[in-house]
């Protein structure tokens, strides 16, 4: 059953990025840069999602540190309920349509 499903949806090529929600992006950057030796590629404001995102490449993948900028955004609610930590993992696949994960 699992093998048939995997054949149908295609192959997961790689982990594209891991989104980690943080309270304070500047403090989190210190940890990821100093303790883990990662380099900051860029910081991006995303008003449409009410977040600031720091991008830290790690080989073929990337860590995204995500800080909410309003208290009523989806990310802020996630942070209030669950605290800092992994918010999402983005996978690169052969054919996104076949995964059944595309929302219209």
Describe the function of each predicted region.
Residues 10-13, 20-62, 98-99, 104:
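Core segments of cupin and vicinal oxygen chelate
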Residues 1-8:
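N-terminal amphipathic/basic-hydrophobic helices that include classical n-h-c signal peptides
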Residues 19-20, 67:
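Hydrophobic side chains within alpha-helical segments
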Residues 64-77:
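Intrinsic, low-complexity N-terminal interaction/targeting segments
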Residues 22-26, 70, 81-104:
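Vicinal oxygen chelate
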Residues 8-9, 76-82:
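Short, flexible, solvent-exposed loop/turn segments with mixed acidic/basic and small polar residues
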Residues 12-15, 86:
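Core-facing hydrophobic residues within beta-strands of well-ordered domains
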Residues 55-57, 67, 92:
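Short, well-ordered beta-strand micro-motif
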């Amino acid at each position: 059953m699992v093998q048939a499903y995997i054949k149908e949806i295609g192959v997961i090529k790689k982990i594209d990025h891991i989104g980690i929600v943080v309270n304070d992006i500047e403090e989190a950057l210190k940890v990821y840069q100093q303790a883990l030796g990662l380099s900051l590629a860029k910081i991006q404001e995303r008003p449409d999602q009410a977040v600031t995102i720091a991008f830290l490449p790690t080989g073929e993948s990337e860590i995204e540190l995500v800080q909410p900028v309003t208290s009523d955004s989806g990310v802020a609610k996630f942070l209030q309920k669950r605290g800092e930590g992994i918010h999402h993992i983005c996978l690169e696949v052969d054919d996104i349509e076949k995964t059944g994960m595309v929302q219209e």
